[in-house]
Each structure stands twice: as C-alpha cells, then as structure tokens.
C-alpha cells in the first residue's frame, strides 16, 4: 500500500452541506488506504451523508469529487469505481443467493467466474442455502450476501452504511478482514456504524455526528 498521506485524494468533498442544512460545511480528502468511520445516533445524518457521497442525493451546497472530477458530471463513470451498501441488502426474493450474487456483480460491471462466487458463498457461510430463494435468508444472511457482493466487486471505494447490522461474531471478524485487505490493496472506505472507533482496524478517522447536526472530527488526516 502506498503512503496514504502522500497519495492524491480519491474522494474529496468540499464545503459539503446536506439537503437538510444546519451543519457546518464538511471537507474531506480520502486517500488510498484510508477509512472514515461515521458515528452518530439515529437521525444524525449518517445515511444522508453516505447517500450524498454515493451520488444518490445532491448536496445543498458544496461538491463531491472522484479523482478530481465532480461525481455528478459522470455518475456512471463514478459507479465503475464505487460500491455502496445501504440499509437494504439489495437482494431479490425471487432469485437464489447464488443468482443474486451473480446478477448484482454483472449489473455492477464486475462479473466473476463461478469458482469465485462459490468461494465467496462458502467463506460467508452461505453455501448450504445458496440455491434456495433469497426470501428465506435471515437478516444476517442477507447482510453477509450483500457484503460478499461488495467484496467481489473490487471497487476502489466502498461506502458502507451499518455493514455490521445483524452479523454474528464470526461474520464480524470476516468483515474486519475484508476491510483490512481492501485498505491494504489501496482501496478506501467510508463506513457508518454505532460501534466504537477502535472496532475498525485501519480506521484513520472518526466523524461524530449528533442529532443537532453538529459534526466533530476526531483526528485530522483526511477530514478538516
């Protein structure tokens, strides 16, 4: 992994104010190997921030840039490099777990060979029920399937909203390993979670949001 501080920013936000307003402008420069952990109570704006960084919401003020270019100038091009995981696992109940994984990766422009799909299903504990309708998956199983999709996408930037929701201890450990490998390979991530900052290995920054729309930055490597 290259030196994060010396590398140019992959994702940058300048003077960012969300649709609700009321928060001081946020500046962010996320470089290869860096992770920003966004914390805050329900309603503090974590999901809105991630959706704004993903290009799903337009900010009230400011801009989000990928490799120096405004993401809204070429959203399809941005999506070739970014994987977003929201609260919804994005699974079709009519498809099996295996079909969901195969189809989602194809749509994301990141198709994978069958052996890779099988290995991911096995590693995430989904192999036994891989050919059953996804409607039968528990919330935790659905989350693991969504994480397998993010991992196999190999996108440079991951935007993850509560990725640990519904995970057991073993799956949480696998998520940590997945993040470590992503960062070590030069990837970057913004992750929203209620868990303490120390829970995420490789976390270089913590952004604290509160219900009054205040933002407090802990550390100064990639947030200002």
UniProtKB/Swiss-Prot annotation:
GO biological process terms held by the UniProt record: cytochrome complex assembly
Source domain of life: Bacteria
Matches recorded under SMART domains: AAA
EC number(s) on file: 7.6.2.5
Catalytic activity, reaction form: heme b(in) + ATP + H2O = heme b(out) + ADP + phosphate + H(+)
Keywords: ATP-binding, Cell inner membrane, Cell membrane, Cytochrome c-type biogenesis, Membrane, Nucleotide-binding, Translocase, Transport
Membrane topology type: Peripheral membrane protein
Xref: SUPFAM superfamilies: P-loop containing nucleoside triphosphate hydrolases
Every ABC transporter domain range: 1-220
Major site of localization recorded for this protein: membrane
One Gene Ontology molecular-function label: ABC-type heme transporter activity
Family per record: Belongs to the ABC transporter superfamily. CcmA exporter (TC 3.A.1.107) family.
Purpose of the protein: Part of the ABC transporter complex CcmAB involved in the biogenesis of c-type cytochromes; once thought to export heme, this seems not to be the case, but its exact role is uncertain. Responsible for energy coupling to the transport system.
Protein name, as recorded: Cytochrome c biogenesis ATP-binding export protein CcmA
């Amino acid at each position: 992994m290259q030196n994060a501080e010396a590398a140019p920013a992959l994702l940058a936000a300048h003077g960012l104010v969300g649709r609700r307003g009321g928060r001081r402008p946020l500046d962010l420069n996320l470089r290869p190997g860096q992770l920003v952990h966004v914390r805050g109570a329900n309603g503090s704006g974590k999901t809105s921030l991630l959706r704004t960084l993903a290009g799903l919401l337009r900010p009230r003020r400011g801009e989000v840039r990928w490799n120096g270019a405004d993401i809204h100038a070429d959203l399809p091009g941005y999506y070739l490099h970014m994987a977003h995981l929201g609260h919804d696992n994005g699974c079709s109940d009519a498809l099996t777990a295996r079909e969901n994984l195969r189809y989602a990766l194809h749509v994301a422009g990141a198709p994978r060979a069958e052996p890779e799909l099988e290995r991911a299903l096995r590693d995430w504990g989904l192999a036994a029920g891989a050919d059953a309708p996804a409607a039968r998956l528990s919330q935790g199983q659905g989350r693991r399937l969504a994480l397998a999709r993010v991992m196999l996408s190999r996108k440079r930037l991951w935007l993850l909203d509560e990725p640990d929701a519904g995970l057991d201890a073993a799956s949480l450990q696998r998520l940590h390993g997945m993040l470590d490998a992503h960062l070590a390979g030069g990837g970057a991530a913004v992750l929203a979670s209620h868990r303490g900052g120390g829970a995420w290995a490789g976390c270089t920054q913590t952004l604290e949001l509160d219900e009054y729309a205040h933002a407090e930055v802990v550390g100064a490597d990639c947030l200002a």
